[in-house]
């Protein structure tokens, strides 16, 4: 086996017949598989042991050699090598074909590579390959030219012969006629009889003339065809071809089937053809030039690589190892076999029949038919169903060919190479574990014992509870079955599990927080326990969700799990850098209850000298937790009353004691916060809590934040329980004035209806009016209802604290349901006046079901679409890794941070959170000669606040859009890693993080927005489809034109459409745009517009923006438009993630003129490669190539990647592989996917080359500690210890570390 860690690239190419024979261990001659009586493989068959290796370890077929001591011997009786049976997974065979066949990928794929190479239409190519037409493969021009006069003479002689013969025949017939007539005359026959005889004779003579003329024409036709014969002519007329061959066989060769193609390829001159094509490209135009370019691409691929075009025609085909196409016996004596065996059997059967026919010397027509069938059998084996009807198995199911094995979700790439099953894992249902710390999880004992079995067994042997591993295993087995005398097993498990993190994962893993590490705590029962605060990250709830547990084994893996993946280190969300572990639901309610003031509660107005005294009063029942009291507090830094209007008393210093008016509940809450944090003195809802947690995350280290969160969780649950909040039907309080409000609006609605009946308004206007009236009514009822709820009502408290639900839901329960939409998405103008507490009437219930069902259907569709979007995003950005500290670019982009109000004060822009926040400054910010923020520093919340205070409106920041790194991006341009809150590390896979951040909220985006019944104006795509449209760079529906010039607007109305005409300022000719009558204009007659102004309402085409305004503008446009969609759904995503995807979309340029470079016009090249090649050419004094930037959609960009492994595993597998093989593409293995596929460590994070060759050396103390372990020879252990985490990057094989001397 080759070791994947030792090569840097992987090349794919075309295999020639010799290659295939070289790989092979023998020829498969018979279609037999397994002998049904002995169940052993048949000799020379598809499972033959002589070719593929023994079925049993170290045992030959006939049984002469058994045991490992005969390793490597080849048995002289049966010819089987004695070796391991697993060679049957790697040894290949081959089938020698009696006639060559073409490879279907190269002839039938679009575009047909073989057709391009030979300049044949695929239709004609098909005729030749499938024996419907002959092809001329060689013409001896010289001989033909030389012998033409003599041949012509021969032909004319032949024609004269025919004419002579005809004349003789005619004379003969005339003589016979004379005789017949004379005889009739003698008999005295009637004139009638004479006429008949004469006519018959004339008819025969005419036939003789015609026959002769036909022969002469035929000779002419054959000769003309011969004179004009050239290589690659097709001849579909069998008879004509035969005659040609019989007459002029020595001057040309021709044939049909793959044999003809093969002969043609052998004599094909690639260089000459390429030269001719270049000439054509230089002088040609239009269609011709385009075709020449395409052909040159294929031909230069063969010229530039070591590939031979002969590889597209096969003389022998490989047979893949038998263990990859197994045959297993089912109970009942039947066999289940892989489809490949059936396909191979058809090939072998037809091949053997063809050999036999050839030996018998069968007629050509029979042989050709058999050859055609062989070609079809090989086609079906390579790619079933690509041509004609697929070969089907039992039950009319198409058989899975080699191509199908690679394709799709179930194919080799996605099923086995990118998604493997792993050992040391388990899964179970999750339940909540409120007693856990943030970094812990509860692991069921039974599960833990199974997962940690090897560790436990080894420890049992170490502690002398067991003599050897075998008996330790038995002990573990018995402990599981509950025998009390093996209780020490559980103690050992406790010891082993300490400090050994496990990974928990919940599917679907939409972003990196879907897998986190925890320290396991053993629990009884069979359910995994989860900390309530990490549910948001996993998107988990406890209604039966399951989670998987994985065990990191090696020392390195454990270190990574503990440092990088521990849940308390993953408090921030990578999408926007804000905490993801927020108290929710019960916790929010508990804290809200705790910090609320209840007027008139026990002990109100009392004053206490310390918080301890207040707590004592409460314990004695003298004080209510929600009563307003005054307390003298120590160590107060500041007091936050929620409004920011608190002023400290005179002479008070932060840290001095202070008398604060508050409640005991608030004092208890503040104990959960860091001691030097301001005293929070107001009622806390979910929003306030999130502000506080945000602030904590900005100011304090993660450990502190995690501790605070845990405290809050405990407090929240404790007080939510004490609050004893319940809901009964009477808690749903209905507004008493509801009827009255509705009657008033009903009157308005009736008035509108009457106006309509009188014909004063149209139907559309009536609908609009009614919808407005009832929307107003619903809002009024809702307002009335809200005002009417008592402040201590449980329903109101739940909504108000942000624990669960919102006012809209309460409105439907207690107010009125309001307007609903019909299946078409239009709003029905009659509202539902009842609420759920009163109950709906039948009609009301019926019309409200539409929306509900549509919602469910939408969600299902959305999940699938969103998953597919994430997959495409990951694929396009997977090789964007932070590869260097700083690319040193001077370029940057300006971003606004504040906007001036009417009174001249600067207020923070709401979009700062997702645009400027967490970036690196590109230059110093200087105000009044003082540097406020230095170049290269990170912009956090505090910096932004300070800049705004000094009146700074915009800053220049680094961005990945302007990064000049050749591969990936640099740390400075990316800025702060949002997940860690520090500058991003070199090696961070920022591309994948970006893809996950954009894809994960995809399910929350709506599919379609409701149209408010028949409103004019184009329906613009919204939600998920809009995001897809942007990332795929599609031209949107109802596209709005943008101005190509700066000038004045003139608007012309015509019958059908409007014309917007712009007269440029520089006096060049005017530009006109046709827009539909319905489009709403954005410009007015006579207005002055700049280049790139949008002329009508609607969506602009990003390709136009790129063409007219350049790459920078289209980058801004795409980022803004994507953000627009996410903001409308209230999903915060940082711009830098979208920028990474946009950077990938604009990575390539389209070559216009190739100059002296090796590019072809129309080729798509990555920008760094283009610039490098141009520099090289200019240095040598040549002309550089010119190109223009192109915007590629993410699917297209993924398929255009340099890495063929990544592209093939993404989509259109066969097309990508066909192309890659012809171009002998080499995969530099720079992305993540290609390394996962071949099983190398990914080149990101700790797998980066710069981190790989690090050795872990123990400190002196650690060594000393190890030596003091009893019973171990000091020297031997020390020598083995240095081997941990060797530079190989391999996992440490645990079983091999018996603490003994183990030297590699």
Swiss-Prot record:
Function field:
DNA-dependent RNA polymerase catalyzes the transcription of DNA into RNA using the four ribonucleoside triphosphates as substrates.
Any one Gene Ontology MF annotation carried by this entry is: magnesium ion binding
One GO location term (cellular component): DNA-directed RNA polymerase complex
Query: What top-level class of enzyme does the UniProt entry assign?
Result: transferase
**Could you say which residues bind Mg(2+) here?**
541, 543, 545
Q: Which Pfam families match?
A: RNA_pol_Rpb1_1, RNA_pol_Rpb1_2, RNA_pol_Rpb1_3, RNA_pol_Rpb1_4, RNA_pol_Rpb1_5
Q: Which InterPro entries match?
A: DNA-dir_RpoC_beta_prime, DNA-dir_RpoC_beta_prime_bact, RNA_pol_asu, RNA_pol_N, RNA_pol_Rpb1_1, RNA_pol_Rpb1_3, RNA_pol_Rpb1_3_sf, RNA_pol_Rpb1_4
Per UniProt, which keywords does this protein have? DNA-directed RNA polymerase, Magnesium, Metal-binding, Nucleotidyltransferase, Transcription, Transferase, Zinc
* Domain of life assignment: Bacteria
Stretches assigned to coiled coil: none
The family line of this record is: Belongs to the RNA polymerase beta' chain family.
Instruction: Please give the subunit comment from the record.
Output: The RNAP catalytic core consists of 2 alpha, 1 beta, 1 beta' and 1 omega subunit. When a sigma factor is associated with the core the holoenzyme is formed, which can initiate transcription.
SUPFAM superfamilies reported for this sequence: beta and beta-prime subunits of DNA dependent RNA-polymerase
Q: What is its EC number?
A: 2.7.7.6
Residues annotated as binding Zn(2+) 1 are 60, 62, 75, 78
An example Gene Ontology biological process: DNA-templated transcription
- Record: residues binding Zn(2+) 2: 887, 963, 970, 973
* Cofactor(s) in the UniProt record: Mg(2+); Zn(2+)
What is the official name of this protein in its record?
Answer: DNA-directed RNA polymerase subunit beta'
């Amino acid at each position: 086996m080759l070791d994947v860690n030792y090569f840097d690239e992987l090349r794919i190419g075309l295999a020639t017949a010799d290659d295939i024979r070289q790989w092979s261990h023998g020829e498969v001659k018979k279609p037999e598989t397994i002998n049904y009586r002995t169940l052993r493989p048949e000799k020379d068959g598809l499972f033959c042991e002589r070719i593929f290796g023994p079925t049993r370890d170290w045992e030959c077929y006939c049984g002469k050699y058994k045991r490992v001591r005969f390793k490597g011997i080849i048995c002289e009786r049966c010819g089987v090598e004695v070796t391991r049976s697993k060679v049957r997974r790697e040894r290949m065979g081959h089938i020698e074909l009696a006639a060559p066949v073409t490879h279907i990928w190269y002839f039938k794929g679009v575009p047909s590579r073989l057709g391009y190479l030979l300049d044949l239409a695929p239709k004609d190519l098909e005729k030749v390959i499938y024996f419907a037409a002959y092809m001329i493969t060689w013409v001896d021009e010289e001989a033909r030219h030389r012998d033409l006069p003599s041949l012509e003479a021969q032909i004319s002689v032949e024609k004269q012969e025919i004419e002579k013969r005809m004349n003789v025949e005619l004379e003969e017939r005339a003589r016979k006629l004379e005789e017949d007539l004379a005889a009739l005359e003698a008999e005295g026959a009637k004139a009638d009889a004479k006429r008949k005889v004469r006519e018959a004779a004339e008819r025969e003579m005419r036939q003789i003339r015609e026959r002769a003329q036909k022969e002469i024409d035929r000779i002419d036709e054959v000769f003309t065809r011969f004179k004009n014969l050239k290589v690659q002519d097709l001849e579909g007329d069998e008879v004509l071809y035969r005659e040609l061959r019989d007459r002029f066989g020595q001057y040309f060769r021709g044939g049909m089937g793959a044999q003809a193609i093969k002969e043609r390829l052998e004599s094909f001159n690639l260089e000459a053809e390429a030269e001719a094509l270049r000439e054509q490209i230089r002088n040609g135009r239009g269609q011709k030039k385009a075709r020449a370019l395409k052909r040159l691409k294929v031909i230069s691929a063969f010229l530039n690589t070591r590939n031979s075009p002969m590889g597209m025609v096969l003389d022998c085909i490989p047979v893949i190892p038998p263990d990859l196409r197994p045959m297993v016996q089912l109970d009942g004596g039947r066999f289940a076999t892989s489809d490949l065996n059936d396909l191979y059997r058809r090939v072998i059967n037809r091949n053997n029949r063809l050999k036999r026919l050839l030996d018998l010397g069968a007629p050509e027509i029979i042989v050709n038919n058999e050859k055609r069938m062989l070609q079809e059998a090989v086609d079906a084996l390579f790619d079933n169903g690509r041509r004609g009807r697929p070969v089907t198995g039992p039950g009319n199911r198409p058989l899975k060919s080699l191509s199908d094995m690679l394709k799709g979700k179930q194919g080799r790439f996605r099923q086995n190479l990118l998604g493997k099953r792993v050992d040391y894992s388990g899964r179970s249902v999750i339940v909540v574990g409120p007693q856990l710390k943030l970094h812990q999880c509860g692991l069921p004992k039974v599960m833990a014992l199974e997962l940690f079995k090897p560790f436990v067994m080894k420890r049992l042997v170490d502690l002398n509870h067991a003599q050897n591993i075998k008996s330790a295993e038995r002990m573990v087995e018995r402990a599981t079955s509950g025998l009390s005398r093996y209780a020490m097993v559980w103690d050992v498990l406790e010891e082993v599990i300490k400090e050994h993190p496990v990974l928990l994962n919940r599917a679907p893993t939409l972003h990196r927080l879907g897998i986190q590490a925890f320290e396991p705590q053993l629990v009884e029962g069979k359910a995994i326990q989860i900390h309530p605060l990490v549910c948001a990250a996993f998107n988990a709830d406890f209604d039966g969700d399951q989670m998987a547990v994985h065990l990191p084994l090696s020392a390195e893996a454990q270190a990574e799990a503990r440092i990088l993946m521990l849940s308390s280190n993953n408090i921030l969300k990578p999408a926007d850098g804000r905490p993801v572990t927020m108290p929710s639901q019960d916790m929010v309610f508990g804290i809200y209850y705790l910090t609320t003031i209840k007027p008139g509660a026990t002990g109100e107005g009392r004053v206490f000298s310390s918080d301890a005294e207040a707590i004592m009063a409460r314990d004695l029942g003298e004080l209510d937790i929600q009563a307003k009291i005054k307390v003298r507090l120590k160590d107060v830094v500041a007091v936050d009353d929620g409004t920011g209007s608190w002023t400290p008393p005179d002479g008070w210093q932060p840290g001095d004691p202070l008398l604060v008016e508050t409640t005991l509940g608030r004092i208890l809450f503040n104990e959960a916060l860091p001691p030097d944090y301001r005293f929070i003195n107001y009622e806390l809802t979910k929003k306030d809590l999130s502000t506080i947690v945000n602030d904590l995350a900005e100011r304090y280290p993660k450990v502190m934040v995690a501790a605070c969160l845990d405290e809050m969780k405990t407090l929240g649950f404790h007080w939510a329980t004490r609050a004893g909040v319940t809901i009964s039907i009477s808690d749903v309080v209905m507004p008493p004035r509801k009827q009255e409000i509705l009657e008033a609006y009903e009157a308005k609605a009736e008035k509108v209806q009457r106006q309509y009946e009188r014909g004063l308004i149209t139907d559309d206007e009536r609908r609009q009016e009614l919808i407005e009236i009832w929307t107003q009514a619903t809002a009024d009822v809702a307002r009335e209802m809200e005002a009417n709820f008592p402040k201590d009502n449980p329903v109101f408290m739940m909504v108000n604290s942000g624990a669960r639900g919102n006012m809209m839901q309460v409105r439907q329960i207690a107010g009125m349901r309001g307007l609903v939409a019909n299946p078409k998405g239009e709003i029905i103008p009659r509202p539902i006046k009842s609420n759920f507490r009163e109950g709906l009437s039948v009609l009301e219930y019926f019309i409200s079901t539409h929306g509900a069902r549509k919602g469910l259907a939408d969600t299902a569709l959305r999940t699938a679409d969103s998953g597919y979007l994430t997959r495409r995003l990951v694929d396009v950005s997977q090789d964007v890794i932070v590869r260097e500290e700083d690319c040193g670019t001077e370029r940057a982009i300006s971003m606004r941070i504040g906007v001036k109000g009417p009174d001249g004060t600067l207020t923070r822009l709401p979009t700062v959170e997702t645009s400027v926040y967490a970036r690196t400054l590109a230059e110093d910010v200087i105000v009044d000669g003082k540097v406020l923020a230095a170049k290269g520093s990170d912009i956090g919340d505090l910096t932004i606040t300070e800049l705004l205070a000094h009146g700074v409106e915009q800053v220049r920041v680094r961005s990945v859009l302007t990064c000049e790194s050749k591969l990936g991006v640099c740390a400075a341009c990316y800025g702060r890693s949002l997940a860690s809150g520090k500058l991003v590390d070199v090696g961070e896979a920022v591309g994948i993080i970006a893809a996950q951040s954009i894809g994960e909220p995809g399910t929350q985006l709506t599919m379609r927005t409701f149209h408010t019944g028949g409103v004019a104006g184009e329906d613009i795509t919204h939600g998920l489809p809009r995001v897809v449209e942007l990332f795929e760079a599609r031209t949107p529906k109802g596209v709005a034109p943008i101005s190509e010039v700066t000038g004045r607007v003139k608007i012309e109305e015509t019958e059908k459409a409007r014309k917007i005409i712009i007269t440029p300022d520089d006096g060049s000719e005017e530009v006109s745009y046709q827009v539909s009558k319905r489009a709403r204009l954005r410009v007015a007659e006579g207005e002055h517009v700049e280049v790139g102004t949008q002329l009508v309402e609607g969506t602009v085409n990003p390709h136009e923006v790129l063409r007219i305004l350049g790459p920078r503008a289209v980058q801004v446009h795409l980022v803004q438009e994507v953000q627009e969609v996410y903001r409308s759904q209230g999903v915060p995503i940082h711009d830098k993630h979208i920028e990474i995807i946009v950077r990938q979309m604009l990575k390539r340029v389209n070559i216009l003129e190739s100059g002296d470079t090796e590019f072809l016009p129309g080729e798509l090249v990555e920008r760094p490669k283009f610039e490098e090649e141009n520099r090289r050419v200019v240095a040598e004094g040549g002309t550089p190539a010119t190109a223009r930037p192109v915007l590629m959609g993410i699917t297209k960009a993924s398929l255009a990647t340099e890495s063929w492994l990544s592209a093939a595993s993404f989509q259109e597998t066969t097309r990508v592989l066909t192309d890659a093989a012809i171009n002998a593409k080499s995969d530099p293995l720079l992305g993540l996917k290609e390394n996962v596929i071949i099983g190398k460590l990914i080149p990101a994070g700790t797998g980066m080359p710069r981190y790989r060759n690090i050795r872990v050396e123990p400190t002196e103390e650690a060594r000393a500690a190890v030596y003091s372990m009893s019973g171990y020879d000091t020297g031997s252990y020390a020598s083995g210890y240095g081997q941990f985490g060797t530079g190989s990057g391999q996992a440490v094989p645990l079983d091999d570390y018996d603490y003994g001397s183990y030297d590699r």
